[in-house]
Amino acid sequence: MTSSIATLVHRYFSAYETRDRQVLEGMLDESFTFSSPLDDRIGRAAYFARCWPTSGTLRRFTVEKMFAQGDEAFIRYEAESATGRKFRNTEWLRFEGGKLVELQVYFGRDTRPAAPLPVLTPSPRMADWPATAALFPR
């Protein structure tokens, strides 16, 4: 079952990449629920109203890790927007009878190379605070 779950996961992301709503609609069970930090177990109709409009802003999904067991998969992926912005998320997907019945998304971070952190220089007033002074030995 694990290999077929992997196939379903890749088909799900491919539907977003190709903006094929018909494929995605065929994958989601009528009882489908979606949760994220912004959504709490919304149903199919709300999912398509809230989430599908962003499909036009996403260019590519690269699955970096996938753990599948039974009818469930947990994945980490990097997504790339149409503007080139990249970010990483994780998702837990649960299938029944080949249909996606539950999806939970956990938002990650921007994966563009970070600018170097600025070098901190202590102000004279900071030296008066013992805890702060320990961070900046003279």
Pin down the residues of each PLM region:
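Short, well-ordered alpha-helical segments enriched in acidic and aromatic residues
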Residues: 8, 18-31, 35
